[in-house]
A protein has these predicted regions:
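Loop/turn-to-beta-strand initiation segments
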Residues: 1-2, 25-29, 285-287
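Walker B catalytic acidic pair
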Residues: 6-7, 32
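Catalytic P-loop NTPase motifs of RecA-like helicase/translocase cores
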Residues: 10-12, 37-38
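Short, conserved "post-DEAD/DEAH" coupling segment immediately C-terminal to helicase motif II
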Residues: 13-26, 48
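Short, conserved loop/helix-junction motifs that constitute active-site signature segments
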Residues: 21-24, 53-54, 280-282
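Conserved helicase motor core of P-loop NTPases
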Residues: 35-180, 184-187, 192-198, 218, ...
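Helicase C-terminal subdomain and adjacent C-terminal extension
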Residues: 48-49, 257-324
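Conserved nucleotide-binding/hydrolysis modules and their immediate coupling elements
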Residues: 138-276
């Protein structure tokens, strides 16, 4: 048997140890991008493994870029991978992909996302979502104290229907809202194809219309049973508005245009992996919004972390040579 572990960089050391223990008689294929965000729990085993085994003819790099044909973007990505502060800032400046924080952040475009580190504050996810939704001229419908409009971008936040193609982080756009006395129904255009059509539950149905795929989500507005302990689940929508989102949430997604906002309040959170994940979400346009001192701090940390990692790998390699 061959066990394939996808998004390997996101798997914790504890989890991969358990997987190997369960399937210890199997062969393993680990697939992922070591430059992207590491596991929330402890462990950067995937990155270490690649460096330790790269001379053993078991590491293969897929070097054909499918996300973008924009040469400037691929050059930026390469420089971030290498972690050289001077080269990164020079390219960002030369390609006009860096700018001081301004109101330009609040000018919305089609298939664009604003990536942030924090939820609160003027340039946090919550406020940017409110502001950009307010610029949507369509009528607003309130449900569970939140507003929704036709044209709002959304991202699904459930894995309950992953077997049918509706998975956590699936992107879509609201194209219809039917507001009735007892129910509210959302028609969401899915930005990825699905393999199943029909009712997934009493609340979600997948339909195909022309060349498009749509999720029809219906929720009851009210539950009269005060003893219904499952009421929150029954009324909670499986998606949320996504004009802006966290960089962690954006992992695995791609957009025509990406704006990254890094403020003084959040600069300490930006690791090399987080910054790399953010800039590689863009297919066509990229802009990083930060003050000069923030850019200097963030890119300095990225360069220092790369030097520290190189030293750690050298020590670890010497210790493990006798086992490999």
């Amino acid at each position: 048997d061959i066990i394939i572990v996808d998004e390997a960089s996101f798997v914790s050391t504890d989890s991969i140890e358990k997987i190997i223990e369960v399937y210890k008689s199997s062969a393993f294929m680990f697939v992922g991008d070591p430059g992207q965000i590491e596991s929330i729990e402890f462990g950067n085993w995937f990155d270490l493994l690649l460096n330790l085994l790269k001379a053993k003819d078991v590491v293969f790099t897929l070097d054909v870029e499918y996300r973008t044909k924009v040469v400037e973007l691929t050059k930026i990505w390469d420089e971030v991978r290498h972690g050289k502060k001077k080269n990164i800032i020079e390219l960002l400046s030369a390609y006009e992909m860096t700018e001081e924080i301004s109101d330009d952040i609040f000018k919305v475009q089609e298939n664009e996302v604003v990536l942030c580190l924090n939820y609160d504050g003027l340039y946090g996810i919550n406020n940017i979502n409110r502001y950009l939704q307010a610029s949507n001229p369509n009528d607003a419908f309130e449900y569970q104290q939140n507003l929704y409009k036709v044209g709002d971008p959304v991202v699904f936040i459930t894995n309950d229907y992953s077997a049918y193609g509706i998975y956590n982080n699936l992107s879509g756009k609201i194209v219809g809202i039917k507001n009735e006395e007892e129910n509210i129904t959302f028609k969401i255009e899915l930005l990825e194809s699905v393999s199943y059509f029909g009712k997934l539950s009493n609340e979600i149905e997948i339909v195909e219309e022309g060349s498009g795929f749509y999720a029809i989500v219906t929720k009851m507005k009210y539950y009269n049973d005060k003893y219904d302990t499952d009421m929150d689940t029954r009324t909670k929508l499986p998606f949320q508005i996504s004009y802006a989102m966290s960089i962690h949430k954006a992992q695995g997604l791609e957009f025509d245009s990406v704006k990254i906002v890094i403020t003084k309040e959040s600069d300490e959170q930006v690791t090399k992996n987080i910054f790399y994940t953010a800039v590689t979400r863009a297919k066509k346009n990229l802009k990083v919004y930060w003050q000069p001192e923030v850019a200097d701090y963030v890119l300095g940390n990225i360069e220092n972390s790369e030097e520290s990692k190189t030293a750690d790998l050298s020590i670890l390699s010497e210790q493990l040579k006798k086992y490999i």
